Regions:
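N-terminal active-site beta-alpha-beta segment that forms phosphate/nucleotide-binding
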Residues: 2-128
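Conserved phosphate- and dinucleotide-binding cores of soluble alpha/beta proteins
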Residues: 2-11, 96-201
Length: 201
């Protein structure tokens, strides 16, 4: 709940700053050539697959990348090859539902044209997830992120109580500070094509 006038003004300033960053980095990322996305994504995949937190996990939440997002297919394939249970989100009216995906499972276009599991795929509770890969348009060293504005992951992250959470981002998406709002949730790790950050809030 937002209190007095000064607090409301601060909230509005942060909201506008966040929107500006979202639009700015969406534009920069959209201009990235496919070859650069592929090369940077390969570096990110190497770094994330070497994380001890991921190596220890047996059930991992991932996301199906679109357009110029960090390519997640090679990461998902590597996790399947390592015998991990891979989970993908499906958008529903009030948030995200998690489903198990097996190698070769066909994904369908869901909300916002994001590939997602079929509704018939086995459902997984957030409490079963041990490691989670999270998309972002921007992220800071504290683990606060800017998503696409729907708030889906801000609702999901608190439910992943037993999981280590990790944003995958290109290094130019790492900013000094994300103007967080009261309901924003931070992640534990940030992996870019240049570094691994274990977030400290």
């Amino acid at each position: 709940v937002i209190g007095g006038g000064a607090e409301r003004a601060e909230h509005e300033l942060r909201r506008r700053a966040k929107l500006s960053l979202r639009n700015q980095l969406r534009t920069v990322r959209a201009a990235l050539p496919a070859s650069a996305c592929d090369a940077r994504s390969a570096e990110i995949a190497k770094r994330v697959l070497a994380l001890p937190e991921l190596e220890r996990a047996t059930t991992v939440l991932a996301f199906a990348s679109i357009r110029n997002e960090v390519r997640t297919r090679p990461i998902i394939e590597a996790m399947h090859s390592a015998g991990k249970r891979v989970v993908l989100p499906r958008v529903v009216e009030d948030g995200l539902v998690l489903h198990l995906v097996e190698p070769g499972d066909e994904l369908v276009d869901g909300a916002f044209s994001v590939p997602e599991p079929r509704r018939e795929a086995p459902q997984i509770e957030p409490s079963e997830v041990e490691f989670a890969l999270v998309p972002a348009l921007a992220v800071d060293p504290r683990g606060y992120r800017i998503g696409y504005g729907g708030g889906y992951y801000d609702k999901l992250l608190p439910a992943l109580r037993g999981a280590r959470t990790c944003v995958l981002a290109y290094d130019f998406q790492l900013v000094a500070e994300v103007p967080e709002l009261p309901f924003d949730a931070a992640v534990d790790l940030v992996v870019t094509d240049a570094r691994v950050i274990r977030a400290v809030v």
